[in-house]
From Swiss-Prot:
Residues 52-64 are mitochondrial matrix. Its EC number is 7.1.1.9. Component of the cytochrome c oxidase (complex IV, CIV), a multisubunit enzyme composed of a catalytic core of 3 subunits and several supernumerary subunits. The complex exists as a monomer or a dimer and forms supercomplexes (SCs) in the inner mitochondrial membrane with ubiquinol-cytochrome c oxidoreductase (cytochrome b-c1 complex, complex III, CIII). Its cofactor is Cu cation. Cu cation A2 binds at residues 199, 201, 203, 207. Binds a dinuclear copper A center per subunit. Cu cation A1 binds at residues 164, 199, 203, 210. One of its GO terms (molecular function) is cytochrome-c oxidase activity. This is Cytochrome c oxidase subunit 2. Mg(2+) binds at residue 201. It comes from Caenorhabditis briggsae.
Amino acid sequence: MNNFFQGYNLLFQHSLFASYMDWFHAFNCSLLLGVLVFVTLLFGYLIFSTFYFKSKKIEYQFGELLCSIFPTIILLMQMVPSLSLLYYYGLMNLDSNLTVKVTGHQWYWSYEYSDIPGLEFDSYMKSLDQLNLGEPRLLEVDNRCVIPCDTNIRFCITSADVIHAWALNSLSVKLDAMSGILSTFSYSFPMVGVFYGQCSEICGANHSFMPIALEVTLLDNFKSWCFGTME
């Protein structure tokens, strides 16, 4: 049943935490469908028994017991995976191997690798005449944020002006960037690739032209990119 609901997602999830969240969403949808069927059958039984046994006095002790136990079981089935997800997310935030500071501006992003002195740059959307073959319109940038795969990365999100939101839907990442506040989260990316997102908070006239491009690569390629960028 979970596979049925997973087929109707908007995007495939490309991180471990996002995959767990995707499974938990499908699991809850399956539970809700089961509850809907159960309640429908229960109401049908009650309506039928009311007309069929209306001349008799009946106590619905079994029905009362069932209506007490069934919701408890449903809540327990939701609680166990929910607590597991919270525990897993807490473990991700305990330690990190690399820190990336992300600053939102009107209307571009700045990236600073705090553990690598001198590695910082701005990231602007590419115009139509700058796009290469195969690059997505309104999503590609001149400088991607490059990070190594299978490494716990701490992101520190803030803003230099108005409220922004650093969001990557296919990774289940969305964090508000607010001036004077440093929001942090840790994440690990097991899959190599380029993932695109956009600012998800209306921040002015060019809000729609503030894309995010995150490139996840192998550790050796990341080291080569760092040396090449700082030269």
